[in-house]
From Swiss-Prot:
InterPro entries associated with the record: PPIase_dom_sf (IPR046357), PPIase_FKBP_dom (IPR001179), Trig_fac (IPR005215), Trigger_fac_C (IPR008880), Trigger_fac_C_sf (IPR037041), Trigger_fac_ribosome-bd_bac (IPR008881), Trigger_fac_ribosome-bd_sf (IPR036611), Trigger_fact/SurA_dom_sf (IPR027304)
NCBIfam families linked: tig (TIGR00115)
Protein name: Trigger factor
GO biological process, one term: 'de novo' cotranslational protein folding
UniProt domain PPIase FKBP-type: residue ranges: 164-249
Entry's free-text remark on domains: Consists of 3 domains; the N-terminus binds the ribosome, the middle domain has PPIase activity, while the C-terminus has intrinsic chaperone activity on its own.
Function: Involved in protein export. Acts as a chaperone by maintaining the newly synthesized protein in an open conformation. Functions as a peptidyl-prolyl cis-trans isomerase.
Annotated SUPFAM superfamilies: FKBP-like, Triger factor/SurA peptide-binding domain-like, Trigger factor ribosome-binding domain
Any one of the GO CC terms: cytoplasm
Organism: Psychrobacter arcticus (strain DSM 17307 / VKM B-2377 / 273-4)
UniProt subcellular location: Cytoplasm
Any one GO MF annotation of this record: protein folding chaperone
Classification via PROSITE patterns: FKBP_PPIASE (PS50059)
Length: 447
């Protein structure tokens, strides 16, 4: 810091500090004089040739504006220097006010939001339930059956449509004899049991044969998204064109090769599936206990969050949702109107995330935690196992500094969880593979 800069601080609250900064007026005067001389070289004033305008005229016409520009520049150049000199952990941009020239000094006040220095409560009172699961043969068989279903085909079937069959049909809906928008379609495909349609629709089609026609009566749910249809009784004329049954692919060499199994047959596929499921269990269990631990801490630690942090988190979550929209609907994220996603939609979750970030940072600072590079290497190696060329993935995360920094951040957060768990009480609970993964998916959707 420049030795001629004077700074005093006044902590207004746990999240805000005010600095009073004094800059010697000579700094201002020297810069003002320099700029006035520069302006004089090109200034045009009636009655004088370019470059020959008297300095008194230049000062009279341009002096006040130049001085204000210089003051703004000096404030911009010194405010962050002042913040740094006081070891202030600022959040967002400072707010400048009360600017004045006083006793040979330029004096101004800078109010800045600061990273809260909280005393974390309840660390030794944490009680969480840690879910665990074991992969059994039935789980593996179910997973392989799901892999087959992902590649199932439908072949024509003679006879009545039953659960699991795919029916191709035309339908025409009406309410009180009047057709309604969206109530008709041709060559519509429906798998019986998929619950894709409103209640009663599938039941009306079940048992029909190709070439059969009939009218079914259904009632739209009271909470149906189209308000003009909600709770209304409707009639649908159904014309079944085709009934098909599911045909799963054989567990032959061609099917096995789809999953990278060239040797070892079905047993090798089962082994690969089991290992992948065990990785999923490890990740899901880790995610569950992390969430439970953080939830327990957040219940005991409510504190104000700097507005800048909250605004940044709201914007981050809004951008994430827009990205999900773009992936789901195939549109560019920039094409979505942000006004459709107001701040209020994200405030609760953003406040939680901001508080959690502060808590994690405080644990790291107060306990002197440093990222475990061995865990980083293990993390990268395990992540790479999910890709066709693990060596290439490892090289990418090892050489790309930003990507490695992201992984280090995740690992350090895991170390925080380990520390917190070590201070509290953890009870293990065995759950099924399906329940553990379903809980993880639900947790991710809520974020």
């Amino acid at each position: 810091m420049a030795t001629d800069l004077q700074v005093t601080t006044n902590k207004l609250s746990n999240k805000e500090t005010q600095l009073t900064v004094k800059v010697p007026v000579e700094k201002i005067q020297n810069k003002v004089e320099g700029r006035i001389r520069q302006v004089a070289k090109t200034a045009k004033i009636d009655g004088f040739r370019k470059g020959n305008v008297p300095m008194s005229h230049i000062r009279s016409q341009y002096g006040a504006g130049i001085q204000q520009e210089v003051i703004n520049d000096v404030i911009r150049d010194t405010v962050f220097e002042a913040i740094k000199s006081e070891d202030i952990r600022a959040v967002g941009m400072p707010n400048i006010d009360d600017v004045k020239l006083e006793d040979d000094f330029l004096v101004y006040q800078a109010t800045v939001e600061i990273f809260p220095e909280i005393d974390i409560q309840g660390i030794d009172e944490i009680e969480v339930e840690r879910h665990t699961a074991t992969v059994n043969e039935e789980d593996v068989d179910t997973m392989i059956e799901n892999l087959q279903k992902q590649r199932e085909e439908f072949v024509e079937k003679k006879g009545k449509a039953d659960k699991g069959n795919q029916v191709t049909f035309d339908f025409e809906g009406s309410i009180d004899g009047e057709k309604f928008e969206g109530g008709s379609a041709e060559d519509f495909k429906l798998v019986i049991g998929s619950n894709q349609m409103i209640p009663g629709f599938e039941a009306g089609i079940k048992g029909m044969k190709a070439g059969e026609e009939k009218t079914i009566d259904v009632t739209f749910p009271e909470d149906y998204q189209a308000e003009n249809l909600a709770g209304k009784e409707a009639q649908f004329k159904i014309n079944v064109k085709l009934v098909e049954k599911s045909k799963l692919p054989e567990m032959d060499d061609a099917f096995l090769e789809l999953f990278g199994v060239k040797e070892g047959g079905v047993e090798k596929l089962k082994d690969d599936v089991r290992k992948n499921m065990e990785r999923e269990i490890k990740n899901a269990a880790r995610s569950q206990v992390k969430q439970a631990t953080f939830d327990a801490l957040l219940e005991k630690n409510e504190f104000d969050v700097p507005n800048a942090m909250l605004e940044q988190e709201i914007e981050r979550q809004r951008n994430m949702m827009m990205q999900r929209f773009s992936q789901q609907f195939g549109a560019n994220a920039d094409s979505f109107d942000k006004d459709m996603l107001p701040n209020e939609l994200f405030e609760e979750q953003a406040l939680r995330a901001a508080r959690l970030g502060i808590i994690v940072a405080r644990v790291i600072d107060t306990k002197g935690l440093e990222v475990d590079q061995a865990r980083v290497e293990t993390f990268i190696k395990e992540a790479a196992e999910n890709y066709e060329d693990p060596a290439e993935v490892i090289e990418y995360y090892t050489t790309d500094k930003q990507q490695r920094a992201n992984i280090e951040s995740v690992v350090l957060e895991d170390q925080v969880v380990d520390y917190l768990i070590g201070q509290g009480k953890v009870t293990d609970k065995e759950v099924s593979y399906q329940d553990l993964l379903a809980a993880q998916q639900q947790q991710q959707q809520a974020m």
